[in-house]
Curated annotation (Swiss-Prot):
Subunit structure: Monomer.
Named cofactor requirement(s): Mg(2+)
GO molecular function list: ATP binding; tRNA dimethylallyltransferase activity
Site positions for Interaction with substrate tRNA: 108, 130
SUPFAM superfamilies registered for this protein in UniProt: P-loop containing nucleoside triphosphate hydrolases
Role description: Catalyzes the transfer of a dimethylallyl group onto the adenine at position 37 in tRNAs that read codons beginning with uridine, leading to the formation of N6-(dimethylallyl)adenosine (i(6)A).
Positions annotated to bind ATP: 17-24
Protein's name according to its UniProt entry: tRNA dimethylallyltransferase
GO BP terms: tRNA modification
Binding annotation for substrate: 19-24
């Protein structure tokens, strides 16, 4: 698309970044300066009754700056990138029709990619192939399956954690069905996003600062009642670690603790480590992202001014 054609499209703003980088705070402050409406781009915030462990904005914050696509599903339900794209496009159209600017904020980079580039023509799921993969995983473990993916599709293996059997299984399944890797197929995108998108990524300049923030926030969640929240979910007896909701960082480790597999201190240690690993994967995505303006989360005023300057130009 030419610059002239792009300039004629309605504007949209992406605020992306790793967990605990200050994305939400920036987005909420921007609402005071620009005619924006917020859309959450977070695969954990979609779930009801999962508030503390997902660092969901508080009721007061949501009253001040409402977020769309938060609290839309029960934790038993799944939600794909295709589901997100459909819902986000609907919300963006609604916001644009009201004469305001969609501001999409979050850290689920797969959702941003699906929205920006469209969905790729991936083969449908094949139950027989998936069963063979799961049977092999039971024999050799998901770590070994991840090494297998590293040989087949190293790019996908970097982005998919060995402890994410759903995405790992899907990447292998795509290859076994089509003979093409997930990375190859996702280069063939569908419909591009019909908006002039201003893309920003926010993170501390030093990785150590992000690690400190992550550890501090995990302890704040625990102090705020994360264990009580997780116990209520655990007591439902209809949730388990094969579900995307319970695989969210923090909840998976809390589940192991509540199941008696690990003690409290180990749960805290693993929870912090898993969150740091998530942030590392998010940063890997962002470093390969095109046309993104980087913001320093340690200078929030400067970050705010930069976004306003770019969007208002």
């Amino acid at each position: 698309m030419s610059d002239v054609e792009n300039a004629s499209l309605p504007p949209a703003i992406f605020i992306m970044g790793p967990t605990a980088s200050g994305k939400t705070a920036l987005a909420m402050t921007l609402r005071e300066y620009l005619p924006v409406e917020l859309i959450s781009v977070d695969s954990a915030l979609i779930y009801k009754d999962m508030d503390i462990g997902t660092a969901k904005p508080s009721a007061d914050e949501l009253a001040r700056a409402p977020h769309r696509l938060i609290d839309i599903l029960d934790p038993t339900e799944s939600y794909s990138a295709a589901d997100f794209r459909r819902d986000a496009l609907r919300e963006m159209a609604d916001i644009t029709a009201a004469g305001r600017i969609p501001l999409l904020v979050g850290g689920t980079m797969l959702y941003f990619k699906a929205l920006l580039e469209g969905l790729s023509p991936l083969p449908p799921a094949d139950a027989a192939v998936r069963q063979r993969i799961e049977e092999q995983a039971k024999e050799i473990g998901w770590e070994a399956m991840h090494r297998q993916l590293s040989e087949i599709d190293p790019t996908a293996a970097i982005r998919i954690h060995p402890n994410d059997p759903q995405r790992l299984s899907r990447a292998l399944e795509v290859f076994f069905i089509s003979g093409n890797t997930l990375t190859e197929l996702t280069k063939t995108s569908g419909d591009a996003l019909p908006y002039q998108v201003h893309q920003f990524a926010i993170a501390p300049a030093m990785r150590e600062l992000l690690h400190q923030r992550i550890e501090q926030r995990f302890h704040q969640m625990l102090a705020a009642g994360f264990e009580t929240e997780a116990r209520a979910l655990f007591a439902r007896h209809d949730l388990h670690t094969d579900m995307p909701s319970i695989r969210c960082v923090g909840y998976r480790q809390m589940w192991s603790y509540l199941s008696g597999e690990i003690d409290y201190d180990e749960m805290v240690y693993r929870g912090v480590c898993a969150t740091r690993q998530l942030a590392k994967r998010q940063m890997t995505w962002l470093r390969g992202w095109d046309d993104v303006c980087w913001l320093d989360s340690e200078n929030p005023t400067e970050a705010l001014d930069k976004v306003i300057q770019v969007v208002s130009a």
